[in-house]
Amino acid sequence: MLMPKRVKYRKSQRGRMKGNSGRGTSVSFGSFGLKAMEPAWITSRQIEAARVAMNRYMKRDGKIWIRIFPDKPVSKKAAETRMGSGKGSPEFWVAVVKPGRIMFEAEGVSREVATEAFRLAAQKLPIKTKFIVRPDYEG
């Protein structure tokens, strides 16, 4: 599971996801990418499930890059706890993903294999996604 080794502050505010992604919007490492079309919090468990699904389908051929990292702690109060008495303890980590962000990239496999691998990965994610091919890809 992905999470920061150490953070300056244990708890963070929720924030809001306005607009499109300002960075990480182009395929830069591999030949194929999976682009987010909606804003969402992607948990470290969802990222890991998508990674495992891709690796299983690609049979460890090629290379996968994970372009998002869960660096935001989400706190939660215990069940049946009364309101007040402070903020809950950090429960899990999320990556804030805005529309246009490339979340995963792949290299070293055919276009058909990459398409299917990303389709399987997209089923593990709570947002609409789009398969992207690098503009200068020769295949």
Curated annotation (Swiss-Prot):
Region (Disordered): 1-24
A single GO BP: translation
Organism: Chlorobium limicola (strain DSM 245 / NBRC 103803 / 6330)
SUPFAM superfamilies named among the record's database cross-references: Ribosomal protein L16p/L10e
Record text on subunit structure and interactions: Part of the 50S ribosomal subunit.
Protein name: Large ribosomal subunit protein uL16
Protein family (similarity comment): Belongs to the universal ribosomal protein uL16 family.
Any Pfam family matching the protein: Ribosomal_L16
Superkingdom in the source lineage: Bacteria
